[in-house]
Amino acid sequence: MNSPVLQDCVREWGEIQENYQDIQETHRLYKQKLEELSKLQTRCSGTISRQKKKLRELSVELKKCKSKAKNVEEEEEQIRDLNNQIRAREKTFFEMESFLPKKNGLYLSLVLGNVNVTLLSKQAKFAYKDEYEKFKLYLTIILMVLSFICRFLLNSRVTDAVFNFLLVWYYCTLTIRESILINNGSRIKGWWVLNHYISTFLSGVMLTWPDGLMYQMFRNQFLSFSMYQSFVQFLQYYYQSGCLYRLRALGERHNMDLTVEGFQSWMWRGLTFLLPFLFFGQFWQLYNAITLFKLARHPECKEWQVIMCGLPFLVHFLGNFFTTLRVVHQKFQKQN
């Protein structure tokens, strides 16, 4: 005669078997829906591609018509109306494509391979974007504290190397995450993405710079700049995130828009006070470049890292300064 414990085990196994049948059926339906989803994605992507091609061809034809329709007011109005509708349709397709699998760019392909990084729901996209923003905030605070410690408390090449390694890892991670966000519909301006690639290169060169006279002559200036840069980035995140939240609530900004380390047109509403901080930081980048170019001409300078750090600082200044200046100029033009 079976023991009560064994009988309980047999009964439990029977219940597990019943649940297992349900799981198998649910999983079968899940795989079926996945196959259907894959077919729908392929069909939708193909249809959108064909429509976009036709829109491009139509835009070319409209340009030809515009050159022939000079001084014919009715035709010019029709052409303007069609162009506006084409632009609106292209924006709609952009929204649609953010929910469809797409081929990774060169950078993501090199880092991740041919992995689909498209998130299929608005909630997942927003959660990933929110996590990206928190990552930037937390690392900015950590970098600010660490640069303060290196600048005022510990004068050691080891702690400096830890700080520079953290910078390399931070900017590498940012570029990967931003590429994924772009694949999911974030409209990050070209310069602000390139800016992080340059920062990754600069941090990598700083990491390899051996201790010596040239390094010590630039060390305190670099750490002070890093501390100030982290402080400004913290200010930008704090105020930009609040501004973006209000504009999204008003329907004036896209849900996937991000905070940036610069100034964009939407920031005129309450964020112009950041401009002096930004311009000061940008001219500090120029000052860093000039300092490094002077050090490169020093009789005792033998390190290649000196000139290779000076060039990225100069590119940073030119890109940041003229991008910010263009936004300010465009805003004043619109006001006039």
Swiss-Prot record:
Q: Where in the cell is it found?
A: Cell membrane; Nucleus inner membrane; Endoplasmic reticulum
| Primary location | membrane
| GO cellular component terms attached to this protein's record | endoplasmic reticulum; membrane; nuclear inner membrane; plasma membrane
- Which named protein is this? Transmembrane protein 120A
Membrane topology designation: Multi-pass membrane protein
Residue ranges crossing the lipid bilayer per the database entry: 132-151, 158-176, 190-208, 218-239, 270-293, 304-329
Which of the residues are on side Cytoplasmic? 1-131, 177-189, 240-269, 330-336
UniProt keyword annotation of Protein transport present: no
The protein's role, per its UniProt record: Multifunctional protein involved in mechanosensation, and plays an essential role in lipid metabolism. May function as a potential ion channel involved in sensing mechanical stimuli. TMEM120A is structurally similar to a lipid-modifying enzyme, ELOVL7, and contains a bound coenzyme A molecule, which suggests it might function as an enzyme in lipid metabolism.
Task: Read off the domain note.
Answer: The transmembrane domain (TMD) has structural homology to the very long chain fatty acid elongase 7, ELOVL7, despite low sequence homology between them.
- MF term (GO), any: monoatomic ion channel activity
Keywords in alphabetical order: Cell membrane, Endoplasmic reticulum, Membrane, Nucleus, Transmembrane, Transmembrane helix
- Quaternary arrangement and interactors, per the entry? Homodimer.
Q: Which family does it belong to?
A: Belongs to the TMEM120 family.
Please give the biological process terms from Gene Ontology that the record holds. detection of mechanical stimulus involved in sensory perception of pain; fat cell differentiation; monoatomic ion transmembrane transport
Q: Which residues lie on this side of the membrane: Extracellular?
A: 152-157, 209-217, 294-303
Residues annotated as binding CoA = 129, 186-187, 236, 239-240, 331
As recorded in UniProt, coiled-coil segments are none
InterPro entries from the UniProt entry: TMEM120A/B
